[in-house]
Regions:
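Short, polar N-cap/turn motifs at the start of nucleic acid-interacting alpha helices
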Residues: 31-33, 124-143
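Conserved tyrosine-mediated DNA breakage-rejoining catalytic core shared by Y-recombinases
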Residues: 25-66, 139
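The alpha-helix within a helix-turn-helix
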Residues: 13, 24, 130
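Basic, Lys/Arg- and aromatic-enriched nucleic-acid-binding interface segment
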Residues: 1-20, 150
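Short, basic (Lys/Arg/His-rich) helix/loop patches that form interaction surfaces
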Residues: 90-131
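Catalytic-site neighborhood detector that most strongly recognizes the C-terminal catalytic loop/helix
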Residues: 44-46, 133-158
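N-terminal core-binding DNA-recognition domain of tyrosine site-specific recombinases/integrases
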Residues: 2-4, 82-88, 105-107
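C-terminal catalytic core of Y-nucleophile DNA break-rejoin enzymes
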Residues: 45-65, 73-94
Length: 161
């Protein structure tokens, strides 16, 4: 079975197309309970920092609050209070994928790509998606987009008759 903690990690990654490391390094001070927003800090190369702000459904915020209790600091920790390592997270996702009967290896990165693909299918522009995922260019967004070549604007618009 998938633990409530693992489920929350997956939901935070999926809603915002977040990198696993952004979720694992999340601190309670970056959560705005009133506005249902979480600020994710991105460590970029060359030492620059960038942040993305993601709005979550109230149901997710309620589960997150219940998970945290009155604890502060790192949001996701082990039973012994240590940070969750990326290798551990990868193992949790792989196990969850097998339990769910998914025929390919499930990783946090798969969820990130799924977010981009879904937002593209819903008609969001690359610039809107970049604000969510923190991608630095439209080219990177396109690299994550897994929609088929056949699925394009000509399915929705008839320019000629």
């Amino acid at each position: 079975a998938i633990s409530p903690r693992e489920c929350l990690i997956a939901k935070l990654i999926l809603q915002g197309g977040k990198r696993a490391n952004e979720v694992l390094t999340l601190h309670t001070q970056n959560i705005d309970w009133q506005r249902r927003k979480i600020i994710f800090e991105q460590s970029k190369t060359k030492g620059t920092r960038k942040a993305t702000v993601i709005t979550y459904p109230q149901s997710v915020m309620d589960k997150l609050k219940a998970y945290l209790g009155d604890r502060s600091g790192l949001v996701f920790i082990t039973r012994t209070g240590k940070p969750i390592m990326m290798t551990r997270l990868a193992h949790m996702f792989e196990k969850a994928g097998k339990v769910a009967g998914i025929p390919f290896k499930v990783t946090p990165h798969v969820l990130r790509a799924s977010t981009v693909t879904y937002l593209k299918q819903q008609g969001f522009q690359d610039t809107d998606i970049m604000k969510v995922t923190g991608h630095s260019s439209a080219a990177m967004v396109c690299a994550y987009d897994k929609t088929s070549q056949e699925s394009n604007a000509t399915e929705k618009v008839q320019l000629v008759s």
